[in-house]
Amino acid sequence: MELISKALEAVRRYPLCDSCLGRLFALMGYGIENRERGQAIKTILHMAAVSDYRKGKDVTADLIALAKCHLPTRRFLAGVGIRVDEERCYICGDLMEGVEKYAEMAVEQLRGLDFVSFAVGSTLPEELLEKEAEVVKSLLVTTGESVKHEVNRRIGKELLRRLSDKRVDKLRPNVVVNVDLVSGQVKVVRNPILIGGRYLKLGRKIAQAKRFGNVRTTLLEKLAYLRDTFGGEDHVIHVSGREDSDARMLGSGRPLVVEVKQPLRYTAQVAPFRDKDVIFLPVGFTDRNEVRRLKEKAKTDIKLYRVLVLSESPLKQDDLSKLSALSGATVTQYTPRRIKRLHPRKKRVRMVYDVAWRLVSPHVFELYIRCQGGLYVKEFVHGDGGRTAPNVAELLNTRLEVLELDVLYIE
């Protein structure tokens, strides 16, 4: 039988523990742990060699090789006057014995965490991995399992036994148990919770994340209740684009993801939030892919703005009719002067799809601008000293000031 001959070749070359021998043939059989498989293989090799020895065949070398990693064979040889010392496993150095002890260490660290799912990761000595690769290559074995996979699987299996109400999730686990077989340490990593939703800003002077100037509060501060709900150490927000702190965000709101870092509770319920300044409507839990999608989507979103504008010169309806020329315009903008200190001089090109207007008084009018995401709307109105072209002020031949800015809708 090829398995037996291959196993005999393995023990002739290397002293292997039950796990490391059994792992070479992990794909042969089902529902058998590598230790059990290795024990069974050694038992068969032992029985065959002892039988041949008693028949007078010269199998002493095979018995000695097997005895280095098999107690019954050592005892048999001792009975016929041949002493063989036990040797460490060539691959793992006997590290595979009792790896389940790390599950016990992990359970202690997991105590007090309210979680549902976990995954196991491991760090193994480089020499161990090199020796495993050497053995597999020299024996031309194609039926094996990697030692790293076995370590993770066995520890995960023991954790499931001890934590019967939890489940393994290799894609999006709440926590990751990292086992370092080099140092003998276990570290539990609490993965962040990502909550998707939409927010509306009903007031002005509200920044997204940082307080500056005359900002009254921030969206980040308003959403701190989510950090507290999940017992997190910190929280950050990932937003699809941004509006100025003095602009309202109306309509159906702007998409965002709230990231709660180092949470203690993964099963809490997410409640919506509302006060006089901000509304947050949670959609559900999400992942990093959604964060990346938000960032990309912000570049192509189409937005509808309402702008209340003050004109230095009096205007008539006929004057505003000139603005129809801006519908379908391609606008070139350099980094606005108001944020130039924060960003290098950079050119961007954005589309203005539609422009509508309403004259409120000779010096005040409303603009409705439907445009590509990323357009600096204030600069599109007043021109920013020629850094944005074309612009509304240039077309009306007057100085303009933005009094109010609202994002009405994001398509």
From Swiss-Prot:
InterPro entries linked: PsdUridine_synth_cat_dom_sf (IPR020103), Pus10 (IPR005912), Pus10-like (IPR039894), Pus10-like_C (IPR048741), Pus10_THUMP_arc (IPR055174), THUMP_dom (IPR004114)
Catalytic activity: uridine(54) in tRNA = pseudouridine(54) in tRNA; uridine(55) in tRNA = pseudouridine(55) in tRNA
UniProt xrefs under Pfam families: Pus10_C (PF21238), Pus10_THUMP_arc (PF22023)
Known EC number: 5.4.99.25
One BP term from GO: tRNA pseudouridine synthesis
Active site: residue positions: D244 (nucleophile)
Record domain THUMP: where: 65-192
Keyword Isomerase: yes
GO MF entries: tRNA binding; tRNA pseudouridine(55) synthase activity
Gene3D superfamilies tied to this protein: 3.30.70.3190
Family as reported in the entry's similarity comment: Belongs to the pseudouridine synthase Pus10 family.
Known function: Responsible for synthesis of pseudouridine from uracil-54 and uracil-55 in the psi GC loop of transfer RNAs.
Listed PANTHER family: TRNA PSEUDOURIDINE SYNTHASE PUS10
NCBIfam families in alphabetical order: pseudo_Pus10arc
Protein name: tRNA pseudouridine synthase Pus10
Organism expressing this protein natively: Pyrobaculum arsenaticum (strain DSM 13514 / JCM 11321 / PZ6)
Lineage of source species: Archaea, Thermoproteota, Thermoprotei, Thermoproteales, Thermoproteaceae
